[in-house]
Amino acid sequence: MYKQIEIFTDGSCLGNPGPGGCAGILRYRQYKKEFSAGYHITTNNRMELMAAIIALESLKNSCQIILYSDSQYLLTGITQWIQIWKKHHWKTADSKLVKNIDLWRRLDIAIQPHNIKDWRWLKSHTGHPDNERCDQLARKAAKYPLNKDFDNNPVVLYNDNDLMKID
């Protein structure tokens, strides 16, 4: 039986491109795990993708997942475009390579062990506590980026010792 995990993600960028941050919250029953990471030069779309990737890659076992995001780019890409891109060798309709192909491939790999029950859109800045918290963490990470390049090695800026470990 899969553990049922809810994931909330957000990305932020101060300029596009510019310093950026990503953040997420993973919920399992009464437990919660938060993360954030900042990068010196990136884009808002890369941060939205990285938030989902970091969350999914942090899970040690296969889980049933509902992922919430305010990013239409992430949600439309993963639910509609990705299968077409893969079928066409990661190229768009005009035969150009998909933007952020490195992260789309990484996200595609990250979802494989899991049962993704749903990808859900949340309108941003409407008061949903987990979405607002992710936004706050992502913006803070963008203000204090610790990675010189987008090197896929996030530095955790926030980690509550009382939070759960999802095994």
From Swiss-Prot:
Binding site for Mg(2+) 1: 10, 48, 70
Compartments (UniProt record): Cytoplasm
UniProt-listed Enzyme Commission number(s): 3.1.26.4
Domain RNase H type-1: 1-143
Necessary cofactors: Mg(2+)
GO molecular function terms attached to this record: magnesium ion binding; nucleic acid binding; RNA-DNA hybrid ribonuclease activity
Broad class of where this protein is predominantly found: cytoplasm
Recorded superkingdom: Bacteria
SUPFAM superfamilies recorded: Ribonuclease H-like
One GO term describing the cellular component: cytoplasm
NCBIfam families found in the cross-reference section: PRK00203.1
Name of the protein: Ribonuclease H
Organism: Blochmanniella floridana
